[in-house]
A protein has these predicted regions:
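Phosphate-handling substructures
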Residues: 69-132, 195-198, 210-211
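Acidic, low-complexity terminal tails and accessory targeting/binding regions
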Residues: 68, 72, 87-100, 146, ...
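GST superfamily/GST-like fold recognition
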Residues: 154-158, 195
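Active-site-proximal alpha-helix that buttresses catalytic centers in soluble enzyme cores
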Residues: 12-74
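Glycine-rich phosphate-binding loop signature in dinucleotide/nucleotide-binding domains
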Residues: 45-47, 140-146
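Active-site metal-binding loops of divalent metal-dependent hydrolases
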Residues: 9, 154, 202
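Extreme N-terminal starter segment of soluble prokaryotic enzymes
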Residues: 1-4
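Short beta-strand scaffold positions
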Residues: 53, 131, 151-152
Length: 211
């Protein structure tokens, strides 16, 4: 099975530099809608057996925009297992403010998750956020699907995908986080071993610019 992961489009809170997490949400920016429309055109000839999205509005809307351009319309199923990392007290806060108060924790969150202490913020642990998402993905093993599109969130998908690729916790953020409206593709035959086909790809935007 080939798994296409897309991070939702850029939102107002992304632009303002705020943590969104699993409780916070904000509308997609007009530029994000344009990017997702371009992504939809890029994927228009890809036949997905199913589209799964987080049930948070920014992810659902992103999935809908992509789907609108598809030559092979299919059902969008929104599920809580794909929600963003639950960040507790951080949700809605300005990232710059938290960086000033908890510099070491913010460095850990961005670069070495083994040093991130979720209890400081009443947030989900690394294990919990990745386990709920990976468990959902591995349950797709029993489906007779060839290609699936999964629309989710930056922090959760970055950690979950890297975990599926076999990286230990200190290395989950080594290559940085996923960009808004980026594509990451994994392929698997047994849902235990995953091969990375492409990571955090936004080349489709360059193709649009060239055209």
């Amino acid at each position: 099975m080939k798994l296409y992961f897309v991070r939702h489009g850029r939102t107002e809170w992304n632009q303002e530099g705020r943590f969104q997490g699993s409780s916070g949400d904000s509308p997609l920016l007009p530029t994000a809608v344009e990017e997702l429309d371009t992504l939809g055109k890029h994927l228009a000839q890809t036949q997905f057996d199913k589209i799964y999205s987080s049930d948070l509005p920014r992810a659902v809307r992103s999935a809908e925009i992509i789907q609108e351009e598809s030559q092979f319309p299919t059902e969008i199923v929104s599920v809580p297992e794909l929600r963003e990392w639950q960040l507790g007290k951080l949700e809605g806060a300005k990232i710059s403010t938290i960086e000033a108060i908890y510099p070491h924790q913010m460095t850990a969150f961005r670069h070495n998750l083994s040093q991130f202490n979720h209890t400081f913020f009443d947030a989900e642990s690394v294990y919990h956020t990745t386990h709920r998402t990976i468990s959902f993905i591995k349950n797709l093993k029993d489906k007779n699907y060839e290609q699936v599109l999964i629309v989710g969130h930056g922090a959760n998908l970055t950690a979950s995908i890297r975990t599926m690729l076999g990286y230990d916790t200190p290395l989950l953020r080594k290559n940085g986080g996923l960009t808004n409206a980026s594509i990451t593709i994994l392929e698997t035959e047994d849902f235990e071993n995953f091969e990375l086909i492409t990571w955090n790809n936004t080349d489709y935007l360059l193709e649009k610019a060239e055209n």
